Amino acid sequence: MIDSDGFRANVGIIICNRFGQVMWARRFGQHSWQFPQGGVDEGETPEEAMFRELYEEVGLRPEHVQILTSTRSWLRYRLPKRLIRQDSKPVCIGQKQKWFLLQLKSNESAIDLNACGHPEFDDWRWVSYWYPVRQVVSFKRDVYRKVMKEFAPTALPFQTREHHHSRRGRRR
């Protein structure tokens, strides 16, 4: 679904483990890594889209995860001009995303990147919470920073809100 401003409705999914690490996945046949995400179909709620994408992209079902929280509002990013398909109608200039933070309840062996036969990802790993903000493609970085900051109190209740604050040296 593309809105009147040209943004496609989309859900983003951050899966965390009990150690506060997040699942980071490599796009199939590419060198870019990202969180699972996907479009919201006509008549589908964001939560329904999230569970559909969760299975399609990483093979997890609702019983494998627990929803911890979701973003208060939709977050947007614009696509670089080279990625905009001018021949499609309506033209999609970017994504508006509702993000979900999920806790993996099952064993990680439930993760199956080939669950649907047309994999979106070809590898995955657990990374530290703030790692994706520095590593994602530049046009998604601002959204990732906002999402991670909003989710930090839930995902990392006993750690500092920003990783770099704890690394700063003392002033003399």
From Swiss-Prot:
Top-level class of the enzyme under EC nomenclature: hydrolase
GO cellular component: cytoplasm
All copies of domain Nudix hydrolase, residue ranges: 6-149
Record keyword Thylakoid present: no
Annotated SUPFAM superfamilies: Nudix
Motif window: Nudix box: 38-59
GO molecular function: mRNA 5'-diphosphatase activity
Family: Belongs to the Nudix hydrolase family. RppH subfamily.
GO biological process terms on file: mRNA catabolic process
InterPro entries: Nudix_hydrolase, NUDIX_hydrolase-like_dom_sf, NUDIX_hydrolase_CS, NUDIX_hydrolase_dom, RppH
Superkingdom field: Bacteria
Keywords: Hydrolase
E.C. number: 3.6.1.-
Pfam family, one: NUDIX
Source organism: Shewanella sediminis (strain HAW-EB3)
CDD domains per the UniProt record, alphabetical: NUDIX_Ap4A_hydrolase_plant_like
Hydrolase in keyword set: yes
Cofactor needs: a divalent metal cation
Protein name: RNA pyrophosphohydrolase
Function: Accelerates the degradation of transcripts by removing pyrophosphate from the 5'-end of triphosphorylated RNA, leading to a more labile monophosphorylated state that can stimulate subsequent ribonuclease cleavage.
